[in-house]
Amino acid sequence: MKTITAQEHKQILDIRNESLSSLPPGIFEKDLLLTQALRHLASTDSEGMGLVFCGGTCLSKAHRLIERMSEDVDFKLVVPEGLSRTARSKRLSQFKKRVVLVFQEAGFHVPPEQVVARDENSYVAINLLYESRFSPVASLRPEIKVEFNARPPVLPTAPLPIRSMLAELIADRADDFQIECISVDETLAEKVLSFLRRTAEVRAGRNRAEYDDRLVRHLYDVQAIVAHHERLKSEPPHAHFAALVAGDAAQYRNQYPEFELDPVGQMRDVLQALHAQPDGFERDYLQFVDELVFGETVSFAEARSVFSELADQLLGSMHSV
């Protein structure tokens, strides 16, 4: 089963011994293996599929806008146009099998039950199991989750260099590699929508899985994006946000019909709860910051304020779109 090398193990211990970081060794270990999984994907023949890195891990590793551990790897898939529904599903299935094989050949353990596919393979989640050489970290899951969504990016993408937290800390650029990445603007719109729609889904009792108490990460991430790109305060991606909302409404119409009928109302209810019933959100946020943020911390009040202001602008523009 996949594990870090003896040299990597020593480097992680040296970081702790030299007081370069107070983070548990298991966090560096998981990030290192996650980065290696990314490297294998970047060098894989995607057989005509466009592969675009996105999400919080992209913000951390590629755009370098957030200083937190992100243990999920998210990708958008660009499927060739002109395929029939059957051909599209088959093409996505072939890609899924190919990627699983790539991870297995890299040493990760991928049991069949750890591969989930929905919507004719338009959504695929793969859990990569590895052997840890350190004590478990309570805040981390024991697997690396890789998700693929066959919804292409709308805004232009760009290749960016990727490196591990370990390499970043010791200023080692020798093993950098590039991967196509989603834009910051698109990420901002997705994070606002993800927090609002997924929280609203739970409040409506329409969630398939248990509530993800780390959804509050989107508040932290949005604040970090705006801190580095202040233009987004006055120029948020209105049109793109509206397109994303329409896409989610269509994708989840069977699971969450209320969202298709009134997406703005459902999301505004969450914004109101964020201020009127903040206790649960603040508890989750403080725990998230304590366990996974290794850079400068941001208070719940500040993150909520920045997020709410942006979300309010984006939702307000929906009535005129």
Where are the regions a protein language model picked out?
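Nucleotide phosphate-binding site architecture
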Residues: S60
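Structured mid-to-C-terminal alpha-helical surface segments
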Residues: M1-L51, H63-E67, V78-V321
